Amino acid sequence: AYQHIDYDEQVTIKEAQFRQVIKRIGGLDIDEDEVEVVSSSNKWHYRNRISLNARRTETDEVIYGFIARDNRSLVRIKECLLAHAPVNELVPDLNKTKWGHKNRQRDRPLRATIRHASSNKETVAFYGKAPVGLPWRREVYNDREFVMPAGSFSQVNREVAEALQRMCAEIISSLEACTFVIDAFCGSGFLSMGLRDVKVVGLEIDAKGVEAANFNAQDQGLTTHKYVAGDVNKLLRQRLGKLAPETTLILDPPRAGVGPGTIKAISKRSPKWILYVSCDPGTLGRDLKEILPLGYKHKKLAMLDMFPQTSHFESLILLELDNA
């Protein structure tokens, strides 16, 4: 945690960490002035979601909190300084909710997730995986409403997430020759929903996420957007093989990175541009080490502080195929 460090210094440290990791693992030497930095104006209480571990005490009470440094003990909390106020308001009352009563009856209580939606301001709690019957969340980003499956991934810092979506749209709109975008690991289509005037195909293994993405596209009048469910690497090999070179490939994988399957697909038919968004500079560096030798050069880099008071951050790099 970085809570003991002045916030401006936190951002400086993270930007330096980004450059150092990309150089050490990815072999890409980056000057300090090359990295665009996006800070968070909300330094505390920015998270719209938290997950709390559960533990049954000797008095048969179920308590919620975070795992301590010893990786065994549970530290009971009344509030989280990084969470939205509506999220914190529900923490003391977890055992009073409908799911809380059910959780208390389990031999081993499940961890609790509390989410606050920006659209209808509703705060909900569930235990373990999101129940099948739980309604889709409605979130507002950049003045547009999105639906997302209740248990799906979404960024926890709305302000910086909006900045990330705008940045991706601005980058792709600046690529005048680009007419087609593949949004790999697209989830509910968050990043590519900011795109206009280009054709978009999104690829995602989660069928519920794809259902939400297609709904969002239709709801926002994006008739040139289509989202497909299936194995991303297999779909990527099929799609890249049919497309003109003037294609931008958005990569927004989980923390584990894209892996060899995606790298192999890119090596078979390299798109003109790759816009890689990452929450782990280590796996980004690992993947860059494989992608850069395919003929790519970096054109833009950014570090977005999605997670103030922690060592984590979001990063972005635009690569362009060098045909010289």
Regions found by a protein language model. Name each.
Residues 1-251, 256-262:
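Accessory RNA-recognition modules of RNA-modification enzymes
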Residues 58, 120, 189, 282, ...:
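Surface-exposed, flexible loop/turn segments at secondary-structure boundaries
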Residues 68, 303, 321:
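Active-site donor-binding loop signature of nucleotide-sugar glycosyltransferases
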Residues 228-313:
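S-adenosylmethionine
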Residues 310-324:
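Core SAM-dependent methyltransferase catalytic element
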